[in-house]
Amino acid sequence: MRRTAVLGSAGTLIAGTLIAGAMAAPAAGADSRHHGDREARGVQIAADRAADAGIDWADCPADWAIAAPIQCGWVSVPLDYAKPNGKQIKLAVDRHVSTGTKEERQGALVYNPGGPGGSGMAFPKRIVTKNPLWTKAAKAYDFVGFDPRGVGHSAPISCIDPQEFVKAPKADPVPDSEADKRAQRKLAAEYADGCAERSGEMLPHMTTPDTARDLDVIRAALGEKKLNFLGVSYGTYLGAVYGTLFPTHVRRMVVDSVVNPAKDNIWYEANLNQDVAFQTRWNDWKAWVAQNDAAYHIGDTPEKVEQAWLTLRAAAKKNPIGGVVGPAELIGFFQSAPYYDSAWAPTARIWSDYLGGDTQALIDAAAPDLSDTAGNISAENGNAVYTAVECADAKWPTSWKKWDRDNTRLHQQYPFMTWANAWMNLPCATWPSTQRTPLDVRTGKGLPPVLIVQSTRDAATPYEGAVELHKRFKGSRLVTEKDAGSHGVTGLVNPCVNERVDTYLLTGKTDRHDVTCTPHATPKP
């Protein structure tokens, strides 16, 4: 699940055979039986074609900023799997070949970082940078990244002019009046209309099951009999959907920081639950800042840190910092701390420096760079994909009374993120395209053990999601980092977690029972 700025506020999301093989089961309840059968046949046809065509690997285009020895290529997929011979779109993929011997190589490891709307094209760089946490896996696997449909170089979608999207300051996401709410509702409806105007042809085909089908076509194009997959955040839901649709096509699957896959959680309830988890982790960070008051001088109790935050918000609302940083931009910056432990010290330092008179560091961190054209296009695209996927995946409440009631209630106890998250997702209430019924994620015949990794205090994907997927994927193993909260645990600093991920990827073996790891060390100021 992703973090970004949207509309009038800042918000979060929430990081096979050469021939496709047996026909995948259609998504239960996601389509009519007839349409689901057509999509199942369509993905088989597309995978057959991709297996025959392969991927023409070559140096990456210069403007992609991906240097050799990483290679890039394209995989063609149907826009609509019910019409496999209709319009095709091209998906960008890249790879770094395994560093081991021919005997050590086990295939390709395909990665999705989450979002929805995140690009996986940076994944192969983990080999180039010689990250020691990935050395063993790099000997066994080609590291493969891709831009999912609608993202980056893969038929990118857009909902609003990028310069308009990033302009600041935006309205305070916490409404002071009914007029404030009406203004935000208007922005949300206009944003949804903009998606239809700029990207209408793509919108009905931006679902997670569509991307899972793309993943199976990529598998076939890679020449892989079965898929090895690493998914983080939203990538865990993509993996869960893939595992349900194509259980016999999975070889190894690691899912890290898990979206709750229950049908009634996708996606409205997921975002409400996220508001609660963000407040919990925000409180953890405030306590840490208070414990380290000698370094930061923000407040020596969590209550004083909270008061300092409210004072900062109020001042920025009255007079935006540098003319561009108001409450929305502050939330967009400060939410890094609940997301990632690695952001705790840098975020506190910038805040401390601001209180000491250095405003520029906070402006640089929180305000958009209007001169960064490429970055702003990417940010707008990522937000458009986030919205399109979540709105298309499920039927959302259309009654403003329900949205207002639920978020007003939540804000009373969990104020840090609630309204920002609500406005970010409100376009789904007036979504101008098809909304499906989520897939019933379950263990299918032939699905191997899946490794699930999760910290208990994750803000973006609450721990209950990992427990739910563990119940649904029989034979899976759950590795829990207790009393920790970083979003995306794999490859960080906990050897208890990393050793089990390595062992699973290299051997397919898991512990006989679920494992609870002690937390990694608390960040130092």
Predicted regions and their residues:
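Solvent-exposed, charged interface segments at domain starts and junctions
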Residues: 31, 62-78, 82-83, 87-91, ...
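Secretory targeting and sorting signals
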Residues: 1-31, 75, 215
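Alpha/beta-hydrolase-fold enzymes
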Residues: 288-390
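An N-terminal domain-start capping segment
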Residues: 13, 18, 26-27, 42-56, ...
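Gly/Pro-rich cap/lid or specificity-loop segments adjacent to the active site
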Residues: 36-329, 388-525
